[in-house]
């Protein structure tokens, strides 16, 4: 089924432009409320958001939709995405909602949905929601006496802070560590510095002054330069860069170098395997993860289970294969012993635990393998299907033959933007760059002809 509303991570788009309009947000509330309105009990939904300006608008629109469908709404305010997943379970809600466009700029926003178990919704349920969104839902509205109520929940962020702190081993404190943290002017601007301070660290926060339009603006995990500068400036032991909704993390070592999600997964997998905590004999990661990670794990008799791009697919693979570590190169790290979705703060705490226990620097701890040269370029498209063109297919086949067993090629449409992503990796950087440039040129020519 071709998706009209949902991408790889919920519904996303520019605020006040379809599909991210208050009208559709209200209809999503009605549709989702209708699907999860099962049984005679009073149904409830929790709604969290990040700090972008349009969050107020979409939050109120969704409240209207859910209450019209007869559900009670608990409003959490700004809180990390993993906090919404946790509180959906804790508050015995039927559905959880996070209003966020993650690492995107403030102009964008999105709607992420969680089931009562705290996991993101399956493709099947999303398809049911899509079907309802295109129907007249008047008959689905609650009777006047059954309309829902809405209330703001106080203290919810402190419950999440306690949950995050409990993931640090009890024999470890952060005393003696100077930690610079960039909260991207986003959802974790209160919780992350507080959690680190309560665990004993000296905390140097940046990106903690949201104003509605500065979320992810030259800060956070997609713009690590600000944190790199701060790490040098204050001589921090480590830098932690979160994104707008704090479900992803990158680390900056004491030398100012960026440590990506692949290296972080290697650290956690190694540490947990040594402690007998790693389940399933491996980890799950997407097709974007570096070949170097796969080779590193193979050398330790651990398996890398590759999935489609999107942390929800990583989680599905983890549940299917009994794994408890998974993630993405971009910094989504899922640790199912502690939660149901990516959690930047919790992942960072696991790295800090290894640093404290081994007494080594972050650069010594986190540089586990030499990444295979990887080149990623995007081709913007506005119409047509360039990947179905015969010339493009032949160019892809030729590229795969050139890489053979010494590399990988991945070409896919973005699930959140009008882009085709072209990625290749291999031991010969020159060859990889040439292959990517040739494919970008071929796809671009087909795009231009279609336009």
Swiss-Prot record:
Record's comment on post-translational modification: Activated by phosphorylation.
Biological-process GO terms, alphabetical: carbohydrate metabolic process; peptidoglycan biosynthetic process; UDP-N-acetylglucosamine biosynthetic process
InterPro entries per the UniProt record, alphabetical: A-D-PHexomutase_a/b/a-I, A-D-PHexomutase_a/b/a-I/II/III, A-D-PHexomutase_a/b/a-II, A-D-PHexomutase_a/b/a-III, A-D-PHexomutase_C, A-D-PHexomutase_C_sf, Alpha-D-phosphohexomutase_SF, GlmM_bact
Pfam families in UniProt: PGM_PMM_I, PGM_PMM_II, PGM_PMM_III, PGM_PMM_IV
GO MF assignments: magnesium ion binding; phosphoglucosamine mutase activity; phosphomannomutase activity
Domain of life: Bacteria
Presence of keyword Magnesium: yes
Modification type Phosphoserine: residues: 102
Metal-binding recorded as keyword: yes
GO cellular component, one term: cytosol
Catalytic site: 102 (phosphoserine intermediate)
Keywords, comma-separated and alphabetical: Isomerase, Magnesium, Metal-binding, Phosphoprotein
Known cofactor(s): Mg(2+)
Binding site for Mg(2+): 102, 243, 245, 247
Catalysed transformations (reactions): alpha-D-glucosamine 1-phosphate = D-glucosamine 6-phosphate
Enzyme Commission identifier(s): 5.4.2.10
Cofactor stoichiometry and binding remark: Binds 1 Mg(2+) ion per subunit.
Recorded family membership: Belongs to the phosphohexose mutase family.
The protein's role, per its UniProt record: Catalyzes the conversion of glucosamine-6-phosphate to glucosamine-1-phosphate.
HAMAP family membership: GlmM_B
Descriptive protein name: Phosphoglucosamine mutase
Protein encoded by which gene: glmM
